[in-house]
């Protein structure tokens, strides 16, 4: 720890900010570094906690999530593959970008046309999502590779491909706007409340320990099919 300099640490923070990491995420990293330095000082491994001097810049307010309009979704369909693949999969599954990046072909059940999310951070996030009929051909076309989105193995690469599609249809959205749109559309179509929570990976009192009964899967399919 005594060999680590302030400039080295600040350059790490600067790089994180330049790649689009949020202020709150960088603050958590600074807190962790500070705790490591405090522990090192107690054990006489160093004498100064440089984390206290790290500059995170200004905490800019995060843009509120904006749902896609029906017109924008229709423009995505007209855009065609492969450019429209990522946004449409996100829009019709409600997945997080990180979940899509980690989705493997083996997680897809061809017979039942479902996908199993296993890379979630929480227990409730591990879930099964029925695949909407409209995006089945997109998914099926990608099942020869190990990963469904084989061309994007990092968030930054997925974000680049997503932004290409947004520019092509002349709109501005984030990947998380797709998840927000998914939830909003289900609400607008009167989807079952518990089905919506299960699809999004939120905890629900009706389904325990991640066990999906035939009935609950049927409810999920019914909810998914409400999306046009």
Segment roles from a protein language model:
Residues 55-56, 70, 93, 102-138:
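Conserved tyrosine-mediated DNA breakage-rejoining catalytic core shared by Y-recombinases
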Residues 23-29, 42-97, 101, 121, ...:
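Basic, Lys/Arg- and aromatic-enriched nucleic-acid-binding interface segment
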Residues 17, 31, 90-92, 186-188:
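Short amphipathic helical patch at the helix-1/turn junction of helix-turn-helix
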Residues 23, 78-80, 93, 129, ...:
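Short, basic (Lys/Arg/His-rich) helix/loop patches that form interaction surfaces
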Residues 67, 121-123, 200-226:
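Catalytic-site neighborhood detector that most strongly recognizes the C-terminal catalytic loop/helix
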Residues 2, 47-48, 111-119, 134-164:
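Major-groove DNA-contacting interfaces characterized by cationic-aromatic clusters
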Residues 1-39, 43-45, 152-157, 172-177:
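N-terminal core-binding DNA-recognition domain of tyrosine site-specific recombinases/integrases
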């Amino acid at each position: 720890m005594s060999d680590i300099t302030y400039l080295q640490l600040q350059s790490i923070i600067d790089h994180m900010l330049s790649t689009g990491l949020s202020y709150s995420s960088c603050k958590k990293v600074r807190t962790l570094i500070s705790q490591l330095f405090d522990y090192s000082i107690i054990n006489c491994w160093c004498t100064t906690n440089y984390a206290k001097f790290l500059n995170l810049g200004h905490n800019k307010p995060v843009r509120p999530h904006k749902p896609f309009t029906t017109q924008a979704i229709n423009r995505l369909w007209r855009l065609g593959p492969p450019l429209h693949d990522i946004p449409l999969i996100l829009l019709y599954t409600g997945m997080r970008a990180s979940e899509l990046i980690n989705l493997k072909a083996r997680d897809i059940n061809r017979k039942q046309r479902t996908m199993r999310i296993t890379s979630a951070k929480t227990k409730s996030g591990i879930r099964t999502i029925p695949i909407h009929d409209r995006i089945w051909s997109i998914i099926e076309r990608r099942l020869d590779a190990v990963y469904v989105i084989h061309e994007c193995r990092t968030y930054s690469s997925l974000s680049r491909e997503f932004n290409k599609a947004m520019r092509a249809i002349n709109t501005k959205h984030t990947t998380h706007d797709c998840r927000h749109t998914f939830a909003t559309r289900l609400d607008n179509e009167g989807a079952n409340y518990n089905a919506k929570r299960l699809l999004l990976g939120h905890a629900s009192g009706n389904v325990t320990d991640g066990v999906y009964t035939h009935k609950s899967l049927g409810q999920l399919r019914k909810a998914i099919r409400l999306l046009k």
